[in-house]
A protein has these predicted regions:
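Conserved acidic donor-binding segment of nucleotide-sugar-dependent glycosyltransferases
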Residues: 349-360, 368-374
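Conserved donor-binding/catalytic core segment of Leloir-type glycosyltransferases
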Residues: 210, 225-247, 253-256, 265
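Membrane-proximal helix-turn-helix segments that form the acceptor-binding/catalytic region
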Residues: 93, 100, 117-120, 124-128, ...
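A short, active-site helix/loop in glycosyltransferases that binds the activated sugar's phosphate group
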Residues: 165-201, 210-213, 345, 400
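Acidic donor-binding loop of glycosyltransferase active sites
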Residues: 176, 301-318, 333
Length: 412
């Protein structure tokens, strides 16, 4: 089976060590493991490093079953902004030009959405050639654009972004099948596009492979954390990720002022890091160690009592299961999050953490875990069990590969 994958904004096999594999790399690896060949289309610009892998179109033959094709674009310096939209438009334009010269079509394609523009260009090209397409929807673009505006401005914003709404609905309807990370998310996408669900529309959880961290790695990580003053002598809760506008760190500041004996370890970087540091001024129990690698994350989890998933309650997360939730389950830690909807249901029904709010502050949830060691351990066990049942990497991606194989069989 010849498979095309289109996914920008994720790490690639050519990016070197220390990268966290996401949908594109994970699916590529599983397909190759199953004996299939993959052409992975992506951007020549790295979303993670904000650097160009190449300034022009390049093709990289990784092995006999994997080729990576890099589409050039202008790039951008911030996660959110006009430059990113311009980059995506240029990316789609260049992809369209490359496809005009393409002579070989795949048996099936798996297209990441967003970006809207590249997904639209490739799905249209494939539809004309009667190639089945699975559209993997991971974010609620362009609705997220409108949500970023004050409510009074949202009707105007919806008019401004109308072309994106038109293009996204057309692309979703053109797809042979949809995939999403949570049932509520899939239903939202179908409602948004006014599309009936079909037998090929499926939920495939966003998850990552385990392993790869050795005892030596953990030993080195422990020494590094000792230097940072994080050794587990005091209870620890932590956040790992990019400091972005989609997170609300104010509840952490309030909890840190109240719980002076707790260490709040906030790891990562991003556009909003400076603002978060200003919010935490004078709080010696809040630690910013910067970006950390996998061994440091795993050791930090071993000495922590809970993981923080401080998402704002916006539609994109209310109907979804964001990666910070999955990460906590993988690490076997109780989840502390304000998210309603899909995540709140998951937390309550599986007893894997707490949903904090103005009525049930974050600090109270943390104090409860400290005072109830048996409950903390039980929630940790529940988290591991839930991960194994619903988010296990091999189960998810073996199922996804089988799904693609069956779709191709049914087309022939």
């Amino acid at each position: 089976m010849k498979v095309w994958i289109l996914q920008t904004g994720e790490p690639l096999h050519i990016d070197g060590e220390g990268q966290r594999p996401m949908r594109a790399m994970n699916l590529s690896n599983k397909l190759i493991e199953s004996g299939h060949s993959v052409v992975l289309w992506s951007s020549a610009f790295s979303h993670q490093s904000k650097l160009h892998r190449s300034k022009r179109y390049t093709s990289h033959k990784i092995n006999k079953n994997l080729e990576i094709r890099l589409i050039p674009s202008g790039g951008y310096s911030r996660h959110i902004g006009l430059k990113r939209l311009l980059d995506h438009a240029q990316l789609a334009w260049n992809l369209k030009g490359l496809l005009k010269r393409e002579k070989v079509k795949p048996d099936i394609a798996f297209i990441g959405y967003p970006p809207i523009e590249t997904a639209a260009v490739m799905s249209k090209w494939l539809k004309k050639r009667k190639v089945p397409v699975v559209l993997d929807v991971k974010d609620l673009w362009p609705s997220m654009f409108v949500e970023a505006f004050p409510k009074v401005m949202q009707p105007i914003a919806r008019i401004i972004f109308y072309p994106y709404f038109y293009l996204s609905r057309r692309t979703i309807n053109d797809a042979t099948a949809l995939s999403a990370m949570a049932p509520a998310f899939l239903n939202w996408v179908l409602d948004f596009a006014h599309k009936d669900k079909n037998k090929n529309d499926k939920v495939f959880r966003l998850t990552s492979p385990q392993g790869g961290v050795t005892k030596e790695d953990l030993s080195l990580a422990q020494k590094w954390w000792d230097v940072q003053g994080v050794d587990g002598a005091n209870p620890v809760v932590f956040f790992v990720g990019s400091f972005m506008s989609v997170f609300d760190f104010m509840p952490i500041a309030i909890a840190a002022k109240k719980l002076k004996n707790i260490q709040f370890v906030l790891c990562g970087d991003g556009d909003y890091l400076r603002g978060v540091k200003e919010t935490m001024l004078g709080l010696d129990n809040v630690i910013f160690p910067g970006w950390i690698d996998r061994p440091k994350i795993e050791f930090l989890a071993k000495i922590s009592i809970a993981s923080l998933a401080t998402y704002k309650n916006i539609d994109n997360f209310i109907v979804n299961t964001p990666n910070k939730i999955v990460d906590a389950l993988l690490l076997g830690l109780p989840i502390l999050s304000p998210l309603k909807g899909e995540v709140e249901t998951l937390i309550k029904s599986n007893k894997v953490g707490f949903t904090y709010s103005d009525n049930i502050p974050l600090g109270d949830c943390i104090q409860f875990l400290i005072n109830n060691d048996k409950m903390q351990k039980k929630m940790s066990e529940n988290a591991k069990k839930l991960y194994d049942e619903e988010f296990d990497f091999d189960k998810v991606y073996n199922s996804l590969v089988s799904h693609l194989e069956n779709m191709v069989k049914n087309e022939t």
